[in-house]
Design a protein with these regions (language model features):
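A transmembrane-helix-recognition feature enriched in membrane-embedded lipid enzymes
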Residues: 1-43, 90-95
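Membrane-embedded segments
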Residues: 62-123, 137
Length: 190
């Protein structure tokens, strides 16, 4: 609870006053703190992580966002409905989330221009091209339009494979947030 409150205060009071570089460091530090509190350890190979990459990841859980931000702070593309979620929508809107109205090609073009602009400025942008969460054991069809901004900006696409593992080396499905699993159930399972 204290960590969530600190995230709200950070977003409300401190981030608006910071330089872009400081904002990204704070986002990363807060994500690391959250993952530490949840007992999540991140392993990442950043050998191909150039400035301004489009991170293309599978989507298992709500914590995927913090896993990515802990390693490579990024702007995210999310479905427009997220903006209307209590507290979380407000946080997302103030933490570099670009909201996409699904099913609107016109809006997709606008979002793609915004993403290409960020990539052109050297910012990382993350997308979950499956458009939903899964248990992480397989991939769904990718919505290819989400890859267009990297092509438009001449920036690389960095594939990100997110999976969760127990300390004993067994794959963990605890973080999954798919099907009939509620946010509360997912959080308790982690």
């Amino acid at each position: 609870t204290l960590l969530v409150l600190s995230g709200l205060l950070l977003t409300l009071c401190l981030l608006p006053l910071c330089s872009e570089a400081a904002r990204l460091r704070l986002k990363s530090s807060w994500a690391v703190a959250l993952l530490d509190a949840l007992g999540v350890e991140v392993e990442a190979d950043l050998a191909h992580a150039l400035p301004g990459v489009l991170l293309v990841a599978n989507h298992v859980s709500w914590i995927d966002i913090y896993v990515i931000n802990a390693v490579m702070p990024a702007a995210f593309v999310a479905k427009a409905e997220v903006r209307d979620w209590p507290v979380l929508g407000w946080l997302a809107a103030r933490n570099d989330t670009i909201f996409l109205r699904r099913g609107s090609r016109g809006h997709a073009h606008i979002v793609n221009r915004q993403v290409a602009e960020l990539l052109g400025k050297g910012r990382h942008v993350a997308v979950f091209p499956e458009g939903t969460t899964t248990d992480g054991r397989s991939l769904l069809y990718f919505h290819a339009a989400l890859l267009q901004p990297a092509l438009s900006a001449g920036k690389p696409v960095l594939p990100v494979a997110i999976s969760y593992w127990e300390a004993d080396g067994q794959r963990s499905l605890a973080p999954r947030y798919d099907g009939d699993i509620s946010l509360g159930q997912c959080t308790r399972a982690i």
